[in-house]
Amino acid sequence: MGAGGPRRGAGPPDGGWGWVVLGACFVVTGFAYGFPKAVSVFFRELKRDFGAGYSDTAWVSSIMLAMLYGTGPLSSILVTRFGCRPVMLAGGLLASAGMILASFASRLVELYLTAGVLTGLGLALNFQPSLIMLGLYFERRRPLANGLAAAGSPVFLSMLSPLGQLLGERFGWRGGFLLFGGLLLHCCACGAVMRPPPGPPPRRDPSPHGGPARRRRLLDVAVCTDRAFVVYVVTKFLMALGLFVPAILLVNYAKDAGVPDAEAAFLLSIVGFVDIVARPACGALAGLGRLRPHVPYLFSLALLANGLTDLISARARSYGTLVAFCIAFGLSYGMVGALQFEVLMATVGAPRFPSALGLVLLVEAVAVLIGPPSAGRLVDALKNYEIIFYLAGSEVALAGVFMAVTTYCCLRCSKNISSGRSAEGGASDPEDVEAERDSEPMPASTEEPGSLEALEVLSPRAGSPEQEPEEEAVPELDHESIGGHEARGQKA
């Protein structure tokens, strides 16, 4: 079709090769979230060989997680500059090299630099591009795709931890690290299938040699002026302060309540099993026509349910009540995991998603470095898990309430502004708005600053005919900034 044809030919295919991309995203998400926790099964041997304490060896996983979250902006810049596939291939090699080099480490600091920094950076360079490509391939089925991809985290965690235990018993921690390094080469295979989706050819940059406009697009910090994005960032910060604390302390909390060791460890398996079921189920539910426009409120409900679960279960002492807590916690935790990136994609749109995701992960890294360590120190000081559950539950519940209230206020404000302009401006207002958009250095989105309003119209194909040309420009931006380098190579 010509350039002025319908958007349907240029939009996300919602299937086809997208299912292969979804499978790769499932694997990458599993490695990114499951690997730092799976490495902890080697800590006992590391303590013995290096004569270190638990807190010293635990820094390996902490550094890995800090790199996964904290290098988000760097990953965004690299994806925009080189495309998703090259970044993921390089990330897979880095992650594998980090674990292989770690198997030859003779000091803990060498483990920090190899398994912590190199492997963490490699996982980050795989995780973020995979989510970006998922958003380019799915639109109508995007909630379901996000839910299925997010299920990789509990699935891989339930597989990698027993595998690490087995490898450690048979080959020692050095052999286990070496084999884990080989396992991480699967990230390269996942990166190889990340070809850009079919669509119109990328537009040429009007400025010579890339110029200032090109450099500006490497990381779109202007997204921080979008009040909808600010709402999401504050919500994620509050959420990350307390969301992971109960899962980290659950086993020790159960042992403190008199539960035997084997039964206490089984509680995490219950959380994992419910989480595996909840993520794709919630993704399918969020994709329903009547619910999809209200995904931010569904996300808020999941956060509120998770926080209330922590608050209600803070005084649970019997094994039966702890099992009930694990079921409720796993369900709400899975809902949060399935919806968090869907809300961000719907809020900022595909062109700004790489930059937005990088900035969100950076903010989340700060919260993760504050929340769980502070909870551990409070437990050591107070010898009381109940207060920790109250604090964690309050933070997550507050995040849910904040998200719901501010989303409602933003939508009302946007509707009032739009109705006021249509009543006063007449026919000249659209021209003024278009002129303002043309004067901006980089087109960021077709929505007004309060882009939460876009969540009420999530199906572009149902829009009015007058909006078709604007909608058609979005995939072109995607291909230019994310997959343009790969698309040019294929065309050549």
UniProtKB/Swiss-Prot annotation:
Membrane protein topology class: Multi-pass membrane protein
Cytoplasmic membrane side: 1-14, 80-85, 137-146, 194-228, 279-293, 340-352, 408-492
Locations listed in the record: Basolateral cell membrane
Region (Basolateral sorting signal) residue spans: 426-460, 461-482
Domain of life: Eukaryota
Bias-annotated ranges (Basic and acidic residues): 476-492
A GO term for molecular function: symporter activity
Region listing for Disordered, in residue ranges: 419-492
Signal sequence range: none
Tissue expression from the record: Expressed exclusively in retinal pigment epithelium and choroid plexus epithelium.
CDD domains the record matches: MFS_MCT3_4
Topology, Extracellular side: 36-58, 107-115, 168-172, 250-257, 315-318, 374-386
Disruption phenotype: Deficient mice exhibit significant differences in lactate concentration and pH in the retina and display reduced visual function.
Disulphide connectivity of cysteines: none
Gene Ontology terms: cellular component: apical plasma membrane; basolateral plasma membrane
Record comment regarding domains: The two basolateral sorting signals (BLSS) in C-terminal cytoplasmic tails direct SLC16A8 to the basolateral membrane.
Membership in a protein family: Belongs to the major facilitator superfamily. Monocarboxylate porter (TC 2.A.1.13) family.
Biological role stated in the UniProt entry: Probable retinal pigment epithelium (RPE)-specific proton-coupled L-lactate transporter. May facilitate transport of lactate and H(+) out of the retina and could therefore play an essential role in maintenance of metabolic and ionic homeostasis of the outer retina.
Protein name: Monocarboxylate transporter 3
Organism expressing this protein natively: Mus musculus (Mouse)
